[in-house]
Amino acid sequence: LQQSLVQHTPGNIASLQDESRLARIVFSLSTIAVLTKIFGFAEKFVIAHFFGTSDTADVYFASTGIILSIIWLVRELMYPSLLPVFADSLSKSASASGNLFRKAFLSAAGFLAVAALVLIFFCGHLTKLLLPGFSESKRLVTVNLLRMLSPAVFFLGLTMVTYTTLNARKKFLKAAFPEAVLKLFIVLGLIALLPVLGIYALAVVMGLGGLGCLLAQLYFIPEHKSLTKQDNDKNGTEYFKNVLLLMGPLVVGVIFSRISGLVDNLLASMLPSGQLSYLGYSKKLIDAILLIGPVALVTVIYSQLSHLASAKEYEKFTSLISKTFRLLIYLSVPVACLLIGLNQPIIRVLFQRGEFTADSTFGTSRAFMIYAFGLITFSLEVLFVHSFFALKDTKTPVTYGILCVFLDITLAIALLKPLGFLGIAGAFVISKTAKIIILGAILNKRCAGLFDLKIVPYLIKLSATTCVLLLSLRFLLGINNPDSLINTFAFDLMLPGIGALLVFAGCSYLLRIDEFKALVSLLRYRRAAISTLYEEAK
């Protein structure tokens, strides 16, 4: 790196320094994301140990599904609309950014207060509407839990505003770290309180943890001082109007995206007890994998894409999307193959203890396998949607997102009777795949040269490498071993998983796949593939 700096001009040196900084951020953010998902998934371990796939586990997934729908509604509205506008306001004046933050924060607080009141006073009607298949006893527990979770909705919803603001200020680590601490607090709190309070312990720890996370993120935002001031800065008002203009087209699409998950739970509530939990455990595991890799990468890339689009550097914009696309494909294809091939050992090692029985493992692993088929789709969806957002185009992904939600619901209803919970999972994967095909085609038209013929040799190399991985995985899975948890971990999971990945890495090296070099750079030097993505440091 020192030799490279000597050989480059001052302008290139600055570029290298920016790339190195982004690389360190990606690595650190991925590390925190890993810890966050470990702590977050430890919550599922605790629930699995105490409740397995019983009625109480169904209540847990149904209740958190409703709560998180409200919280993520705020995030999905705020992140693509507030982030680029707040970033612009920082270059104007401190009063403009402060006024914008105040208006966004208080507006979200008003919405969340109404949502919390609805949970308190109309929860009974809500559960009858959203969970019609629940028995009276399950519905009563769900109602009580949702009412107790209303403060958590308010606090955690507001953290979506502070999280977005910190990302707009490029304080990625300060945005992510409090969330990791929150997840750890929830896990420790559940372990301590579940034996005493039962499932209602969830409301206590989420409420207290949400308040702590909000206060921590507010501390790192200089504009938090504006919350107690009445500032009539006209620029701040105009910026807030721009946020609302960007948010407007998102509202219907985001609501429909939340409806999709709620309808899945609605349909699953009419199936035999435990099948809603099968979907819940498996979907959360896929989400954890996505957040550790693709989402962490795209979170940083999105900020850079927004700046490139604002500066009208469309050639670099297209190049960054193209190279990120290739990297995501390279990461997700082998991981998807491993998840599909090792679905039962993964679920058994992670969950099968306490109240989580062998039957629970069998059902959850089947749902997990279906979701694993969609890992590539889910990874690319994050990139494509955020690419449109960086271009300040929220209408296109929202429009096709709505159409795909209708497709998801239609397929889920059609497949429910013949396939049960597997039909719900399959419908979700099919609809998401249709969405990324459409968005990819539109993005390719807007960004000339995005998916040109240069990608064909790469796809051929990747296909050949993947075939070798599948053959090696099949061979290693054929090794017989005694049926115990330790042997399952060693011979059914680690041996075939690591062995197949080593074969994949070796083939990538022999075929000189560039994305393999980027990953080696990440592991050896803690420099993520940013330099490789830009190719400016050569």
Regions found by a protein language model. Give the residues of each.
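Membrane-embedded alpha-helical bundles of multi-pass transporters/translocases
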Residues: 2-538
